[in-house]
Amino acid sequence: MALESERNDRHIVFSHANGFPAGSYRRLFEHWRGAGWVVHAIEKIGHAPAYPVTSNWPHLRDELIHFIEREVAGPAWLVGHSLGGYLSVLAAARRPDLACGVLLLDSPVLSGWKARALQFAKATGLGERFSPGFVSKRRRQHWPSAEAAFEHFAVKPVFARFDPAVLRDYIAAGMEPSGPQHALSFRREIETDIYNTLPHHIAGVLRRHPLACPLAFIGGTRSVEVRQVGMRATERLSSGRVRWIEGSHLFPMERPVETATTVLEVLEEALPPS
């Protein structure tokens, strides 16, 4: 999916969070497009049979790399939320010619003993009990209508914090007809597999293949994920290019305009003088 603009010399390749198709970020995309950027995004990462979900996500990384090769004539800013941030940094490390910068939205880099603990948990299967995948594999999938799905999610604590327009966009992008009902289009088993195969090796990859472009980070002030992972590696890799937005791990959905504006500020600061 690409959103066109009158200027085509500035490109954002955006990668979504797990379980949230790219269309869920419509308000961000429109803001960036209005500022003169061309926005490209895979609609649902991990759903193409050629790119299966495996440990440390090498095929998902390649899905992003091949998408950039097809869609963008030259390097782009790789902006990603959660899952998308990790894939962006892995793609930039693998193919530095495709990235002029990486911006992580609440994707703190795991390192040290926490990375080793995750590796052990994955190898033994113990991690599945504590992974978000434990919840996602039991998630309801079908509703009588899209409106019924909206009403269901609107009262859930996580989704109740969303900007109402973003929740509508999530329903529009995340539901599809399934016989007489509507079902989640982001397949539950793929979402669960992504959670259960989180990369434990990113810090090691970046030691062997340091990024050839700037990296920046925007996090949610109340992000549980940031508290769990810590910021030590991210602060080092970003050379202090860190900002915060009030909100949880899903702050792009909670504060879409502020998020879109802050992303552009970070990108503009990193651009060379014209």
Question: Language-model features: where?
Answer:
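Conserved HGGG/HGGXW glycine-rich cap/lid loop of the alpha/beta-hydrolase fold
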Residues: 6-49, 67
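Alpha/beta-hydrolase
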Residues: 140-221
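Conserved loop-alpha-helix segment in the C-terminal half of the alpha/beta-hydrolase fold
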Residues: 206-247
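Catalytic histidine-centered segment of alpha/beta-hydrolase-like enzymes
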Residues: 247-260
